[in-house]
Amino acid sequence: MSAPAAELAQTLDLRLLGRTDYEATVQAMQAFTSGRDAGTRDELWICEHAPHFTQGLAGKSDHLLNPGDIPVVATNRGGQVTYHGPGQVVAYPLLDLQRLGYFVKEYVFRIEDAVIRTLEHFGITGHRVEGAPGIYVRLDDPRSHAMLAQRPQLRVPGSPAPQPDFSGLGKIAALGIKVSRHCTYHGVALNAAMDLEPYERINPCGYAGLQTVDLSTIGVQTTWDEAARVLGRQLQRRLAP
């Protein structure tokens, strides 16, 4: 890697945008990504959105149980249906993975690690679940460090992935990404202090009965601004080469 490229790879410019329109933000991410060149600095956009459901590329209409008056927006990220609304910290890393020197699987791992470290800042233990991207917490003891039986583990090569098991867990962060010409957009949403009722109108991420939580329901009192700053710092650190 040349010296200028190495310097760019170390830089992730943070933009705290506040409340933004979802569709306009997606269009802006697409324009940023399509207009990139070798000298474009990576950016991290953090915002929140008005209430709406988004359907990913794999989305199925039967996971929309009763959207009611909340708009449903088709989008080009990976994954199934999820909900965005006030009190949720949405982070969009706009990265050149080729320049950073890692692949999509590691990128996902690094995003999840940033969320886990963010939760740790608030005294909460985040967990991964085999076969289900995102971060989860124990409903009975969100601060417990005990490992989950459902955690990702080494499998015999060629063996099928197990069906995700969400017993005793609540989902606190959802992940949905898009990679175009080795450049990323879309990202991760961390629930801070939300109205969680809209999640009852869908099968979150395509899983019937999956419980969704936020920081406030598990005993953490914080503001959107604080949660956004902590997540932003962690993503800046964890996404560096």
Curated annotation (Swiss-Prot):
Report the enzyme's class at the first EC level: transferase
| Pathway(s) this gene product operates in, as recorded in its UniProt entry | Protein modification; protein lipoylation via endogenous pathway; protein N(6)-(lipoyl)lysine from octanoyl-[acyl-carrier-protein]: step 1/2
Q: In chain numbering, where does the site feature Lowers pKa of active site Cys fall?
A: K171
Q: Does the keyword Flavoprotein apply?
A: no
Q: Where is the active site?
A: C205 (acyl-thioester intermediate)
As for subcellular location, the record says: Cytoplasm
Amino acids binding substrate: R77, G78, G79, Q80, V81, T82, Y83, H84, A174, L175, G176, G187, V188, A189
TM region positions? none
EC number(s) recorded for this UniProt protein: 2.3.1.181
> Domain named BPL/LPL catalytic: which ranges?
38-241
Swiss-Prot/TrEMBL catalytic activity: octanoyl-[ACP] + L-lysyl-[protein] = N(6)-octanoyl-L-lysyl-[protein] + holo-[ACP] + H(+)
Under the heading Pfam families, the entry gives: LplA-B_cat
Family, per entry:
Belongs to the LipB family.
**What is the designated name of this protein?**
Octanoyltransferase
Which organism encodes this protein?
Delftia acidovorans (strain DSM 14801 / SPH-1)
**Species lineage, top-down?**
Bacteria, Pseudomonadati, Pseudomonadota, Betaproteobacteria, Burkholderiales
